[in-house]
Amino acid sequence: MGGLPTLRIEPVPLERKVRPGDDLAELIAESAELEEGDVLAIAHTVVSKAEGALISLDEIEPSPFAKTLAERTGKDPRVVEVILREAESIVRVGPDFIITEVRGGMVCANAGVDESNAPPGYVIVLPEDPDRSARELRRRLRELVGVDVGVIITDTQGRPFREGVVGVAIGASGVPVLADRRGDRDLYGRELKITIVALGDLLASAAELVMGQADEGTPAVIFRGLKPELERFEGPRKARAIIRSPSRDIFR
């Protein structure tokens, strides 16, 4: 992508665990020195916690259909019931997963319902509107520290035909999530015809290397030095733009 700038990725360990109702921007501002042009990548789990998107399994009564799916997938029937409530539709069911479409059109495993990093007896669900959450976090950070930063909300997803999970951007504000390279030239002068780079997902995956997936306790990172590169692109600034339309989805 041309002459790449020097890039730094700095972890942002928060001072304490996030609780429902917390001002997440305030916690971040207390834990990190933000600069103009930084990009903040933050795990959706802490965004969801701050927004109160925690569900107590003790309050869930599984439906007969949830119990049937639980038998097929080996999952807790209460977790399956939460998945069904969060999903717009079911795409596929496997021996240990339920592939779903959720609000906004994103296709993911188990409707994004997360048991990891949730308090015992609870599950975390996705933010109601991750792009809106990113936009509000960006606005609040600008209000608190007086600098404009990009924000990406991350999750991890599997991919068809590939083992393992990678980071993806499920919410964004102030960052081009797609870089259209069509019309650029390769090393031999040939015009690129179809290359569109998923910048949001690339940043989310890089962030996951620093955040970790277990008990590392680093729910956010700062990218510093990206501003000159990102200013080259005029792509969409919402993560929803990364979602492929059903008419172009060859896997359903």
Swiss-Prot record:
Which residues hold GTP? 12-15, 44-45, 49, 117, 211-218
Question: Which cofactors does the annotated protein need, by name?
Answer: Mg(2+); Mn(2+); K(+)
Pfam families (alphabetical): F420_ligase
Highest taxon of source:
Archaea
Q: Which residues bind a divalent metal cation 2?
A: T156, Q213
Q: Which UniProt keywords apply?
A: GTP-binding, Ligase, Magnesium, Manganese, Metal-binding, Nucleotide-binding, Potassium
Quickly give the catalysed reaction.
oxidized coenzyme F420-0 + GTP + L-glutamate = oxidized coenzyme F420-1 + GDP + phosphate + H(+); oxidized coenzyme F420-1 + GTP + L-glutamate = oxidized coenzyme F420-2 + GDP + phosphate + H(+)
Q: Name one GO molecular function term.
A: coenzyme F420-1:gamma-L-glutamate ligase activity
Kindly list the positions annotated as binding a divalent metal cation 1.
Answer: D114, D155
Q: Which residues cross the membrane?
A: none
Pathway membership, UniProt: Cofactor biosynthesis; coenzyme F420 biosynthesis
Entry note: cofactor: Binds 2 divalent metal cations per subunit. The ions could be magnesium and/or manganese.
Q: What does this protein do?
A: Catalyzes the GTP-dependent successive addition of two or more gamma-linked L-glutamates to the L-lactyl phosphodiester of 7,8-didemethyl-8-hydroxy-5-deazariboflavin (F420-0) to form coenzyme F420-0-glutamyl-glutamate (F420-2) or polyglutamated F420 derivatives.
Q: What assembly does the database describe for this protein?
A: Homodimer.
Q: Which family does it belong to?
A: Belongs to the CofE family.
Q: What is this protein called?
A: Coenzyme F420:L-glutamate ligase
